[in-house]
């Protein structure tokens, strides 16, 4: 069932046909492209949206589809990464093809135990995303997960998280990012720029829900 959901989500997001034309920012263990779509006013500070980092949590692809198609407000600049883990997404698995959890592989207290990888940034996917983030310096980053149905974080930008929660209809929960998480690294690297997690509920999300969350992204992206 999960594989069917992923195939449908990939088709809906247009990745199968559109990915070859998108800018490639890196490659996975198995050689799949990691792509990023740019939209909007390039003179404005960018918002980065990552639809999938755990391959068994594909609902963020529906959000990416909405953000690729919706009209943008003036002065909004988006970078959209459908998946940071294309091998895991193709297999319907949380980890990448090396069995590493890419959201425990960042240089932010990475424990080097379990599935966090042998060392920080040991994986080509996390290494590619780190390089991309350092290059574009996003003013705001949102990473999508499943299935907890909440917005969480604990950084100084709680007002931003609560605003997203209010606009999306999801509850906010104060929660520290785990060791080795991407948002934990980003908050250290760019302390003035919010980076947080949105958890969709389990299973596919409706078009209306994806659109509501996309509108929340745009609202937070307006300067």
Q: Which residues does each predicted region cover?
A:
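Short glycine- and acidic-rich boundary segments immediately preceding or forming the N-terminal edge
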Residues: 2-35
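Active-site/substrate-binding loop(s) of hydrolase catalytic cores
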Residues: 27-29, 44-53, 57-68, 72-177, ...
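Short, solvent-exposed polar/charged micro-motifs at secondary-structure junctions
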Residues: 33-34, 89-92, 182-188
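Short beta-strand-to-loop junctions in surface cap/lid or active-site-entrance loops
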Residues: 35-44
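Active-site-adjacent mobile loop/cap segments within catalytic or ligand-binding domains
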Residues: 153, 179-223
């Amino acid at each position: 069932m999960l594989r069917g959901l992923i195939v449908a989500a990939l088709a809906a997001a247009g990745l199968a046909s559109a990915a070859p034309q998108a800018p490639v920012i890196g490659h996975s263990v198995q050689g799949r492209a990691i792509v990023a779509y740019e939209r909007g006013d390039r003179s404005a500070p960018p918002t980065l949206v990552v639809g999938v980092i755990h391959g068994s949590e594909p609902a963020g692809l529906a959000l990416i589809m909405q953000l690729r198609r919706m009209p943008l407000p003036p002065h909004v600049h988006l970078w959209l990464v459908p998946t940071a883990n294309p091998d895991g997404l193709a297999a319907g698995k949380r980890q990448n093809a090396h069995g590493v959890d890419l959201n425990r592989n960042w240089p932010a207290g990475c424990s080097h135990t379990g599935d966090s990888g042998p060392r920080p940034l040991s994986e080509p996917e996390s290494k590619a995303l780190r390089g991309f983030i350092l290059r574009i310096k996003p003013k705001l980053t949102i990473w999508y997960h499943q299935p907890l149905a909440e917005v969480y974080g604990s950084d100084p930008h709680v007002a931003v998280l609560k605003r997203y929660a209010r606009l999306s209809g999801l509850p906010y929960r104060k929660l520290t990012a785990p060791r080795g998480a991407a948002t934990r690294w980003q908050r250290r690297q760019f302390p003035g720029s919010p980076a947080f997690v949105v958890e969709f509920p389990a299973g596919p999300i409706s078009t209306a829900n994806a659109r509501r969350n996309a509108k929340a992204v745009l609202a937070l992206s307006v300067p």
